[in-house]
Amino acid sequence: SVPPLLKASWRLQATSLVLFPFAIVQWNKMDEYIRSNILLPRNLMIILASGVCLFLHFGTWGWSLVNTSLTHSLLFVTAHPLVFVIGGIIIGRPLLRKQSYGALLGFVGAALALISVNNDSEVTLLGDLAAFAGAVAIVGYLSAGRELRSWMPLFLYAFPVTFIAAVLLTFSSMFLEGTGINEISSMSSFGWTDLAWLPAIAYLALGPGLVGHTGINGVLKWVPPIVISVSVLIEPILGTFIGILIGTANFPDLWTLIGGSIIMCGLYLVISAEEYDLVIDTEE
């Protein structure tokens, strides 16, 4: 009964509250040089851009969850390794052979999975496109994190980015979904504070929020974004399995199974090629 943008805003509002005290502690302990660096216009713009990307990711993915099947939503939103490859082609970066094969497999798999649009009443083209837009947005979020996390304290990066995304989602929900401050809890901008919703949102803030997204930001200091993407290979399988168990998803049709398997093989090739490239660079 909770609209998708509102649901996403609740999660990020709660996550922001969890991150805030850690950010205050790091700000007070930080030396003046790093503090002045954070306040440089260029770095503030990167933080803002990262927050906008996180907002777009949660907004488009959340919308896709109610406009296509759970399996399709997870398959397309976790396809961001393919987005890295497309971006590399656009900027003229040479591709490794396995990356090229992986990208080709990914697009073939996507085309096959989209046949389900005509065969499965749950699947829609717009829903799948929205999920893929979420993958594009998360690439910007990861790239911005890689740029700043090499020197910027974890929570001083994660808090403002999450807060910006939460604010944008809250106002977007007001304008697009008709939610507001004084509405019933399922339509209220801060309805997650109601005891009916608090346990679930607290879990999302502490689990996927603090441990998940903030954990990713933590390792971006040492690991390139595309390597982190290896963890996504299990998400469509695990997410669909859980959805079937709790009754929120149907078993995928044949084209989704075939196309999804090919997409995941393509993602594996892209990621393993990048990891191999990193090993070569390190040895040199």
Task: Please identify what each model-predicted range represents.
Residues 19, 23, 95-117, 135, ...:
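Hydrophobic transmembrane alpha-helices of multi-pass small-molecule transport proteins
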Residues 7, 11, 64, 90-95, ...:
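Hydrophobic/aromatic residues within transmembrane alpha-helices
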Residues 1, 33-34, 114-124, 176-195, ...:
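Membrane-interface helix termini and inter-helical loops of multi-pass transporters
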Residues 18, 80-104, 237-257:
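C-terminal transmembrane-helix exit sites in multi-pass transporters
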Residues 8, 12, 116, 197-199, ...:
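C-terminal-most transmembrane helix of multi-pass membrane proteins
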